[in-house]
């Protein structure tokens, strides 16, 4: 695949990360290591993810080397103290996945934890999907065989009035994804099955 260069970093040509803010990110071979609450990346445009009731999918490829006492947020709202302004997925201290969705913007209208832990030291593909009927979080270690970790029934419309941030929620203090690495070749946002930001592996 042909590659392009953005800010001195090579990306695959179908990757749209030109409108991306990288904050104190150490990037080697497209891998971002999260080592503090000041390390994160996000779409620069404030209106990148505004699905307004359409179907959507948010995906990451992540490897966790350990669990922490605080939640390791994979993505969520970047507004300080306002966790409810974007869909969020995190790794809890137990290693379980957690997902939340808010319509009122002040609390989680729907939230649930998985019964299974995610595997450590293994690259995991994780995607959060809304199909207008259910919110589903799936996990795969090979991008082929998927397991449902979380399923939430509900057709509420997510608040989505902040900016989506990956690698934790740096502006909220301790909710960041320390002990994790993200592969930028599979970080993406889709709305109505169209890729609107990032890159999705085939």
Feature roles, as predicted:
Residues 2-9, 14-30, 183-202:
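Extended recognition patches within non-cytosolic domains
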Residues 23-39, 98:
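Short carbohydrate-recognition loop motifs
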Residues 35-56, 111-117, 174-176:
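Short surface loop/edge beta-strand patches of beta-sandwich-type extracellular domains
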Residues 47-66, 83-87, 185-187:
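A carbohydrate-recognition surface predominantly in extracellular/luminal proteins
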Residues 72-101:
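Glycan-recognition/cleft segments
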Residues 101-125:
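Short, aromatic/His-centered strand-loop micro-motif at the edge of beta-sheets
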Residues 122-136:
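Localized edge beta-strand/strand-to-loop motifs within extracellular or lumenal beta-rich domains
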Residues 150-183:
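Flexible glycan-contacting loops in extracellular carbohydrate-active proteins
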């Amino acid at each position: 695949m042909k590659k392009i260069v953005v800010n001195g970093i090579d990306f695959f040509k179908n990757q749209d990360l030109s409108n991306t803010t990288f904050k104190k990110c150490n990037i080697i071979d497209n891998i971002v290591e999260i080592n503090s609450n000041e390390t994160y990346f996000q779409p620069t445009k404030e209106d990148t993810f505004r699905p307004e009731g359409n179907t959507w999918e948010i995906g990451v490829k992540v490897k966790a080397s350990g669990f922490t006492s605080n939640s390791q947020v994979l993505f969520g709202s970047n507004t300080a103290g306002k966790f409810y302004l974007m869909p969020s997925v995190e790794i809890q201290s137990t290693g379980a996945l957690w997902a939340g969705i808010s319509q009122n913007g002040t609390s989680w209208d729907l939230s649930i934890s998985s019964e299974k832990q995610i595997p450590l030291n293994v690259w995991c593909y994780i995607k959060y999907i809304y199909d207008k009927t259910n919110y589903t979080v799936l996990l795969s270690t090979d991008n082929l065989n998927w397991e449902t970790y979380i399923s939430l029934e509900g057709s509420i419309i997510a608040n989505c009035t902040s900016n989506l941030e990956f690698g934790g929620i740096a502006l909220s203090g301790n909710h960041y994804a320390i002990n994790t690495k993200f592969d930028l070749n599979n970080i993406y946002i889709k709305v109505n099955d169209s890729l609107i930001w990032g890159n999705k592996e085939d």
